């Protein structure tokens, strides 16, 4: 009976279990389950699939609508198995309930999991200078988040390097590699909003959107004005900004200043240190950039303090040398006297110093007898006098040669008494320390220490809103109309603006004020605008701006930012503010805005020719051709070189100056852009799991994206089941992965098409001032001279067809680089567009690219090892071509400067012979024009173009009041003349007259009126009123070591000018020969003088007496008197 009841119970339990399992299995067949995502990044292995069907040549060609899915607990409860669908970029998500009515909610109304990171599982994926990228998991779903605040993220994984707060200084991305080394102030995560196939849901701060995340290099942004410059000690600059917060810093190109940006509000004063005045640093403040001029602080301080005395200026400037001379004199006289007088009272000091330096003293004393120029019995150094002092090395009272045998140090006897003691004994210590040699050394050390103490105490130097009519406004960043009392964005409109065809009506809510005005809107704006604020934006800003307002909202309006320094339009300003909000809408527009540079930090002084360091040469003409003097000039093709030629003729009165300066020499490369590559900073993964079915079943809910997709099947079998899923050998997990690229470290890959040697040559002097590009392919030619390059073979490591990389440091690299669409395992993957969109990657991931795991009962997990190709780590194998940074021109060419000679520059100058003749009459100058553009009292000066017609060929001097000129002499030819002249003026030369003096003759002078002067005072540090800058420059020019060296060689210019390109070499040879000749004659003169003094010849001469007394007095005056050569004269015949 008991057995039957037991069997009955077993059958009932079995039937109940089967029924329950069937119900659960039937329920789970129609219900999908979500899985947890796990992401691992690092130096992971790549597995390449060379099959054609696994490669995506162009990702941009695969267009797909945006997927906008924000999964919440509400949706998971109410969503049916068929509701995971593809949306067409909509921001409204339908929620299907049991009723027939459809409910819609906004994405922004859904719960924000990113803001609840402290209570959810989260992981920090990347930390930039200005924000953080992290991922949050909720109910098995991973959410990507970017935040400008670190609040609430302390408990997240990998939060050790998370700062307590991020800087709020406004920044925008830098997309041009050439500008990164100049303006980079760190990195920031940006969201690229797009409708391409590679987007995914992201939340920036509290604003959900769709797009991709990338890490970009950033620069400062904002309105900043340099209001004052005081380049006298202290060297300060005052800056102001109308924005609530602004950033500035001092940056040297290429320097890492990621965490050195200083924020300020209102105004700030910057004091430059001496290191910042080296001419290599720039001041970056918002949109503005200013080059800090090279200033010798020591020279400038002395010039300012002693501006009325050149002698005091010289003493102050060279005080660093004078103070050393003063210390040397102090050591040699009073300090030495003091040390000699206190040797006995300070015996403990000398014993202490001797104890510290005992090994050195022992070594010197023992090796003293092997030293040259020494006195063996005294131990003193004898170079000049060759005389020994009276004190012996072993402290004998008098010096004697016998002392050498008695002194243990100099003695050669082996059985000396001191040999019984060790070198470390007290006997040897007293002997060594008290020798004359040791004692002199200890006193010298004491003198140096006292001198250093005195030296340390000596001074180092001697010396936009949009208005309806009156009180109703649109403020960027606020979607409602506000009044003039606007403080923060309200929840609804505070006023009303009605734009009609012929008038505009404005009314302020809560008041009885209604204002009417004429319709003065922007014309030809054809777009629909229904709400009041849309009508106002269309009226004042246009349809393009309205489209941005509707589709690209501003989360932070930055109402104080105007973008005036960059000259931004209303649309450009809106886009710049979007960039400040961390959103990139268009790469091309971002590249345009970030490429705008306000200031002179990238400018170079194009007209500056360092004449003070250039050698001078008298130029002799080679021949006369068609009435012209032909000069053949040949110079080494080396950047920074040049020569000042002085042209002269017997018939001319003054020499003509002709300057050739080779500004730079290098190779111009034409290239073809291939792609951009960058490291993978992190990875975003999304996948979906089904209990039954296969990949096709899974893809109905998780559609293919076109690249980097994956699917694993089967995923349901014994030992690998989720709760309430009992399927066997069924199920699938499908999804996709997307990379977050670090564009801050991106490289652009180019293919070399052509290389040409190019020289930038500047000509100044009688031909005016001009700089020209001369290539090895086409000679340069104008009316007066021809230039040609004779190039040597150059091997710079770059060949035609080779792939090169342009790095974020603006340097060029070569090596093993993968070609476009080539999956070879070399540097060059991932392959991207400029804005970080993949253009070649894997279509589907293979099993080796990821790992899949599950539990007996639980959710499945996937680990992504490699999301596409990644070989960026092979960049260490690249070789840097040059130490000089390069700039690309329209991504099609660049110039690589060389620091060595690339050949010869040959110039043929044909000057009319009339230039060397005195003008017979006053020349007729007609059709004159002199137009200038530039700044006053600045380093750039006024760039002027002088044009006129002349009836004569002549040479003329030029001058103008209150201005100094880049050249003071011009070669005028008959007919049309045009010259480029730079003028540095202290006052506006407009409507003044420039005077021409033919052959320097004021009697036949001609005046040319200055027609037009456009003064553009740039707002930077260099172009401020600085009355001492010219004095400093003049002093530096006059005191240049190169200028002094050239002055010494100048007497030999005439002879050396006959040797052409060997001009400078011949001058050095002649100078050395002259020095040896002078030394030879001086040695002869010295020998004669020594003999004269030694023989006392000055005592052998006396006043010549009468002939009658000479015989008597001669023996008393001279020794060895010579006999007379003729007898005395006989006068007897006269008697």
Curated annotation (Swiss-Prot):
Pfam families: Bunya_G1. Coiled coil: none annotated. One of its GO terms (cellular component) is host cell Golgi membrane. Residues 36-314, 485-1067 are lumenal. The chain crosses the membrane at residues 315-366, 1068-1088. Disulfide bonds join 114-145, 122-156, 224-285. Keywords: Disulfide bond, Fusion of virus membrane with host endosomal membrane, Fusion of virus membrane with host membrane, Glycoprotein, Host endoplasmic reticulum, Host Golgi apparatus, Host membrane, Host-virus interaction, Membrane, Signal, Transmembrane, Transmembrane helix, Viral attachment to host cell, Viral penetration into host cytoplasm, Virion, Virus entry into host cell. The keyword Membrane applies. Residues 1-35 form the signal peptide. Residues 367-484, 1089-1135 are cytoplasmic. Residues 437-484 are annotated as: Signal for signal peptide peptidase. GO terms for biological process: fusion of virus membrane with host endosome membrane; symbiont entry into host cell; symbiont-mediated perturbation of host process; virion attachment to host cell. Glycans are attached at residues 116, 210, 588, 605, 980. A motif (Cell attachment site) lies at residues 41-43. Residues 177-195 are annotated as: Non-covalent dimerization. Tospoviruses are transmitted from plant to plant by thrips as the insect vector. The cell attachment site present in these glycoproteins may help in the adhesion of virus to cells. This is Envelopment polyprotein. It comes from Tomato spotted wilt virus (TSWV). The lineage of its organism: Viruses, Riboviria, Orthornavirae, Negarnaviricota, Polyploviricotina. The gene is GP.
């Amino acid at each position: 009976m008991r057995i039957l009841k037991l069997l009955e119970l077993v059958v009932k339990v079995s039937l109940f279990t089967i029924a329950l399992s069937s119900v659960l299995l039937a329920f789970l067949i129609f219900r999908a389950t979500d899985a947890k995502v796990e992401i691992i990044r690092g130096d992971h292995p790549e597995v390449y699939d060379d099959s054609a069907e696994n490669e995506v040549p162009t990702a941009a060609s695969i267009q797909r609508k945006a997927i906008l899915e924000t999964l919440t607990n509400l949706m998971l409860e109410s969503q049916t198995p068929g509701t995971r669908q593809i949306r067409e970029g909509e921001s409204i998500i339908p929620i299907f309930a049991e009723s027939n009515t459809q409910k819609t909610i906004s994405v922004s109304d859904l719960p924000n999991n990113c803001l609840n990171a402290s209570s959810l599982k989260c992981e920090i994926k990347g930390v930039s200078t200005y924000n953080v990228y992290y991922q949050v998991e909720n109910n098995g779903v991973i959410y990507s988040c970017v935040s400008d605040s670190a609040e609430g993220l302390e408990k997240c994984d990998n939060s050790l390097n998370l700062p307590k707060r991020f800087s709020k200084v406004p920044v925008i991305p830098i997309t041009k590699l050439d500008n990164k080394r100049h303006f980079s102030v760190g990195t920031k995560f940006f969201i690229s909003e797009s409708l391409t196939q590679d987007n995914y849901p992201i939340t920036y701060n509290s604003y959900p959107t769709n797009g991709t995340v990338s890490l970009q290099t950033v620069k400062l942004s904002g309105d900043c004005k340099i209001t004052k410059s005081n380049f006298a000690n202290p060297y300060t600059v005052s800056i102001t900004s109308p924005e609530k917060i602004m950033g500035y810093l001092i940056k040297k190109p290429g320097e890492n200043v990621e965490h050195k940006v200083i924020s300020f509000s209102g105004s700030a004063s910057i004091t430059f240190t001496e290191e910042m005045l080296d001419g290599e640093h720039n001041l970056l403040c918002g949109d503005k950039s200013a080059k800090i001029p090279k200033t010798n602080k020591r020279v400038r301080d002395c010039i300012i303090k002693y501006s009325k005395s050149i002698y005091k200026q010289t003493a102050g400037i060279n005080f660093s040398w004078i103070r050393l001379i003063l210390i040397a004199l102090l050591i040699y006289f009073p300090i030495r006297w003091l040390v000699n007088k206190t040797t006995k009272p300070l015996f403990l000091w000398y014993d202490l110093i001797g104890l510290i330096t005992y090994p050195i003293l022992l070594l010197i004393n023992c090796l003293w007898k092997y030293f040259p120029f020494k006195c063996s019995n005294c131990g003193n150094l004898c170079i000049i006098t060759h005389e020994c002092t009276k004190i012996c090395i072993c402290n004998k009272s008098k010096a004697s040669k016998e002392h050498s045998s008695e002194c243990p140090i100099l003695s050669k006897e082996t059985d000396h008494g001191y040999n019984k003691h060790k070198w470390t004994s007290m006997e040897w210590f007293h002997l060594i320390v008290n020798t004359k040699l040791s004692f002199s050394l200890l006193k010298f050390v004491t003198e140096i220490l006292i001198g250093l103490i005195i030296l340390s105490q000596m001074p180092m130097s001697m010396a936009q809103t949009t208005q309806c009519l009156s009180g109703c406004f649109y403020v960027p960043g606020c979607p409602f109309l506000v009044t003039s009392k606007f403080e923060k964005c309200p929840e609804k409109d505070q006023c009303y603006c009605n734009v009609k065809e012929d008038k505009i009506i404005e009314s302020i809510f809560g008041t009885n004020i209604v204002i009417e005005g004429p319709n003065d809107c922007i014309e030809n704006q054809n777009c629909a605008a229904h709400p009041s604020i849309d009508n106002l934006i269309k009226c004042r800003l246009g349809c393009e701006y309205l489209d941005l307002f509707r589709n690209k909202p501003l989360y932070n309006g930055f109402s104080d930012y105007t973008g005036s320094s960059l000259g931004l339009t209303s649309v450009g300003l809106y886009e710049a503010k979007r960039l400040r909000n961390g959103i990139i809408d268009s790469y091309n527009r971002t590249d345009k805005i970030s490429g705008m540079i306000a200031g002179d930090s990238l400018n170079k002084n194009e007209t500056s020719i360092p004449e003070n360091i250039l050698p001078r040469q008298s130029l002799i003409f080679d021949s006369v051709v068609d009435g012209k003097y032909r000069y053949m000039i040949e110079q080494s093709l080396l950047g920074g070189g040049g020569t000042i030629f002085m042209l002269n003729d017997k018939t001319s009165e003054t020499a003509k100056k002709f300057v050739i300066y080779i500004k730079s020499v290098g190779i111009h490369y034409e290239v073809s852009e291939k792609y951009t590559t960058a490291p993978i900073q992190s990875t975003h993964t999304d996948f979906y799991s089904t209990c039954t079915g296969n990949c096709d079943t899974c893809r109905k809910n998780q559609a293919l994206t076109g690249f980097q997709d994956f699917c694993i099947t089967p995923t349901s079998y014994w030992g690998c089941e989720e709760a309430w899923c009992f399927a066997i050998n069924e199920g699938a997990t499908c999804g996709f992965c997307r990379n977050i690229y670090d564009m801050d470290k991106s490289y652009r890959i180019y293919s070399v098409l052509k290389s040409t040697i190019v020289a930038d040559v500047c000509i100044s002097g009688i031909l005016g001032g001009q700089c020209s590009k001369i290539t090895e392919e086409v000679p340069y030619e104008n009316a007066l001279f021809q230039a040609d390059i004779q190039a040597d073979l150059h091997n710079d490591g770059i060949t035609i067809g080779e792939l090169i990389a342009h790095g974020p440091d603006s340097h060029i690299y070569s090596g093993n680089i993968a070609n476009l669409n080539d999956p070879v395992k070399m540097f060059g993957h991932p392959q991207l567009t400029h804005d970080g969109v993949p253009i070649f990657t894997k279509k589907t991931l293979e099993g080796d690219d990821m790992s899949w795991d599950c539990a007996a009962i639980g959710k499945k997990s996937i680990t992504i090892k490699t999301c596409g190709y990644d070989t960026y780590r092979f960049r260490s194998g690249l070789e840097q071509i040059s130490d000089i940074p390069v700039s690309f021109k329209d991504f099609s060419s660049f110039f690589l400067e060389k620091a060595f000679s690339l050949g010869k520059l040959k110039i043929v100058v044909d000057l009319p012979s009339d230039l060397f003749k005195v003008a017979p009459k006053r020349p007729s100058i007609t059709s004159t024009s002199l137009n200038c553009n530039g700044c006053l009292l600045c380093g750039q000066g006024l760039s002027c173009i002088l044009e006129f017609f002349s009836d004569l060929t002549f040479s003329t001097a030029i001058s103008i009041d209150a201005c100094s000129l880049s050249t003071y002499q011009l070669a005028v030819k008959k007919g049309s003349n045009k010259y480029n002249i730079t003028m540095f003026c202290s006052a506006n030369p407009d409507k003044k007259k420039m005077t021409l003096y033919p052959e320097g003759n004021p009697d036949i002078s001609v005046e040319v009126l200055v027609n037009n002067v456009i003064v553009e005072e740039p707002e930077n540090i260099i172009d401020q009123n600085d009355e001492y800058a010219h004095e400093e420059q003049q002093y530096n020019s006059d005191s240049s070591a190169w200028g002094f060296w050239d002055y010494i060689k100048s007497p030999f210019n005439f002879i050396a000018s006959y040797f052409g390109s060997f001009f400078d070499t011949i001058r050095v040879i002649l100078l050395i020969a002259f020095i040896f000749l002078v030394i030879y004659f001086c040695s002869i003169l010295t020998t004669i003088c020594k003999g004269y003094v030694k023989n006392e010849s000055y005592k052998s001469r006396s006043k010549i007496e009468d002939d009658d007394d000479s015989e008597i007095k001669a023996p008393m005056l001279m020794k060895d008197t010579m006999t007379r050569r003729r007898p005395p004269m006989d006068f007897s015949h006269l008697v």
